[in-house]
């Protein structure tokens, strides 16, 4: 039987294997774009990923409970906030370097595209940036935000993806690089949205953003999505700078603004502004989903969600839009002394056999997601 998208969302949150093709009598096609937060491999997480039996790193058990939701979506994106390398020694905060095996495990879990522009992208210098992109290429993962050459920047500043039949142009930016300068002569390496990325971090490069978005509009995709590393760490509300920047992006053509960096969830909303062409434009903004994986221990840095954004294309009108969203609350559960310490745990329901302490933590995570992210909107 045909399923409307709102029904599909709820079905794939409970039984992803049973989700079929979407049909809609009105001539509209609707698909789901999954969005996750910051992928961080602090050393406790890296150590936990080591599998003695395999003699190799394997992150997949850590986020196995999120994988069905990623795989049920038509496309899945996140922010990769570490560098990757085939060789150690590995490190966590403040200069991240993680096993390249993470890339393959993320691809196997269901991710399609990763933002690589963030404040940790130069933690291991130019070589680390290159080895990260090499690892992602080897795993078959698309990426936006950093580049190995001027030619790559010219070709890949905008990544066009087929999201279940809806074309989406993805762009990626970061506010800065933790005071590490972009290598001289390689200004193409990192997509920065601030002109003062080494100092005050307060002056957006409006010319660059407007130029990039004009180029994205010229591709005539159904939608444009901007993945952006911004905001203030550990704040559960957006600030006025984020709102102003979101408005600038939406005004110039962005339909989705997908943020990260705060390490805790921040709200989801729709914003309406005057567009570059004088028309009224409405854009979807997720300011942050917090950490997808990490070993930060605050209850809110452990709290995240797998967000699915509903994208609908009216085939008769030839237009696409965001028509709703839903999410599954997740909690990073740490069990010291066990074979697997870290488990990103589905907090949408209490699993059978959960003790009272775990049940309380999962209920708190779900409540925090509702309070911070807001209520889902589907089928609209």
PLM feature spans:
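A short, polar/charged loop/turn motif at coil->beta-strand junctions and beta-hairpin connectors
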Residues: 7, 23-25, 72, 281
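Short, highly charged low-complexity linear segments
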Residues: 2, 25, 136-138
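Acidic, metal/ion-coordinating pockets
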Residues: 39-380
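Extreme N-terminal tail/first-helix region
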Residues: 1-18, 214
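Short secondary-structure boundary micro-motifs
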Residues: 4-5, 26-29, 144, 292-294
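Structured beta-strand/loop patches that form or line metal/cofactor-binding pockets in enzymes
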Residues: 11, 15-37
